[in-house]
Amino acid sequence: MKFESLFFLCLVLCSCTKRESFNHIEIIGHGGMGVEHPMSIYHDNTVESVSLALQFPGLNGVEVDVQLDLDGELWLYHDMELDTETSGGGCIGSLHSNFIMDLNYNTIQGEKLCRLNQIVPLLDSSKVLFIDVKSFNSCDGLAQNPILFLESLNTALSNTKCEVRVIISNTDWLPYFIPFYQTYYSSDQHAEIENNINTHLGLTGVVVRYSSITESQVQSYKNQGLKVFLYEMRSPKGIKRALRKNPDGIIPDDIRRALIEGR
């Protein structure tokens, strides 16, 4: 009888335990539905992946990786070289639009590579679009021209209704983007982050791999007036750990699980 009473008491206490609330933390789909996640139906950074992700209630927006071609077109693509994921080879920065337009991803669906201006109409004023600016062309070993990239970005986003934020990992490019866009610096090196916070006073925030930052470091950046977004969490445990660090947002590769944990 005592055991039954104790068991009942435990049930009552457990049922009354308040669930952790993470509603204040934004959830942003990484490349749409996620990058390199086995449960993703479509390849990341495609129209299909972004469109599907935006149908999930509670998702605040998407992050996409963007690269500039020789003709000034901006394409969604994550890797440095095309032969890792597509039917083509080389680097986007060394190729013309007509060539890239004919490529497909090496997937069952064979999705086409898409331009940035193809996904812009998918996001309304309630959504956020994070643009991860890829500045380096690994085929020639050089960074691209930031002025040309910025001009192409302005053109592609001319009819945008959503909120736009850019992610920059090349320190030299920060001064070009800060005056025009909400700009986030991406790095796992906290000495570099602090240096750029002091050098570029207009920074909006930082984007950091979730395993490379502590809860106290997150709070330290927030105390300096910066927004903090964490990425590269794929497992339920990783998502939970990232949420508990109390960032302003997370960029998970499993948005279904992130929405379960965070909403």
Model feature map: region roles:
Residues 4-13:
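Sec-dependent N-terminal signal peptides
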